[in-house]
Amino acid sequence: YEIFKNVREENGFVCKSMVVFIIGCTFVQCFLFGVFFHFHDALPKGEQYVKTEIPGSISTKNMYTTVDKKEELGALGGYLTQNHLTEKKVLLYGEIPAISYIFDMEPAVYTTWADLRSNTLERLQADLDAITTDYPVVIVTDAIGQELSGNTSYVDEKLDAIAQFLSRGNYQCGYAQKGYYVYTSQ
């Protein structure tokens, strides 16, 4: 209100309308973001958050998540710690960049989110080609793991590059349950 007091009357309408327009646009943008964009842990009707600690993860102490996600991450964490895989670098694919943070695993390529559109195929391919020893753990989502098991050509060029990398590194799937597939080099 105070900013409107000192505006001269002949210019007052323009200044007031611009301020109202900017504030209005901000509210509309915030509302639309809340309606159309949600975090993956948004709760379906009837579900509740539960407190969890995931094996092999110090960053999730006192974390709250859904029951299903707790089971998925708990099973994955158990497998990774049992096989001492959290000490290795990781390549993630399938919109799961947080796995690197949750299990404190260093990314094997330039990013933890290789499937993000702004991360280019050329950069991913260059990083994969540079890996010749000390092959990383590869973790993908259920859907991507099933697609990789199909031995087909892939529409997604980045996924095709990862499939070729898995073949070159003689990778085997050691874990395929509860939402994730984990591949390790033999």
Regions found by a protein language model. Give the residues of each.
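Membrane-interfacial entry segments at the cytosolic side of transmembrane helices
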Residues: 7-25
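Extracytoplasmic
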Residues: 24-185
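Membrane-embedded alpha-helical segments of integral membrane proteins
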Residues: 1-5
